[in-house]
Amino acid sequence: MQMKKISCASLSPDDMLSLLEITRSYCGTADSWQTLRPLLERKEVWGFYKGTSLVGYALFTPSDRQLGGSVTLTCFRYRWEYNDETSLLQMMELIPTSFAARFHCLLMDVSRTHELNLDFYHRIGFCESILPSPKGRGNVVLLADLKSFPVMKKEKR
């Protein structure tokens, strides 16, 4: 698996269709490319490829000055056939190798109710801080030092 920075202008028709299909599998609101394109253009978009096929994507936003040196993973979506721990680990391990030169910290906002996701993220190096949400339930902000991700430790050896 590999991770490549992508832009709306450089996408092939097959990749556009894949992005739309992946997005539709999570939420029905992206009913057309015209609906999805503005969202993608506001973020830094990276695609996860298995061979030449786009199997997932992630949207990132560099954080403001208060959290300088960090990047926020705002959206992480993939084809359902890649919803297994091995595939998810492969995708997540590609992030620090792509961002560690520019950022030191990766942030993610995850709902407290997603216990399996939280357990997975903890095992790959994230720590957490609970923040109250507007509805009072509280979300978990996950933080990870990009240089201490397990994959980065392997590369240092």
Regions found by a protein language model. Give the residues of each.
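Short, high-confidence coil segments that cap the C-terminus of an alpha-helix
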Residues: 43, 101-105
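Conserved beta-strand in the GNAT
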Residues: 47, 53-63, 69-72
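Conserved acetyl-CoA binding element of GNAT-fold acetyltransferases
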Residues: 67-81
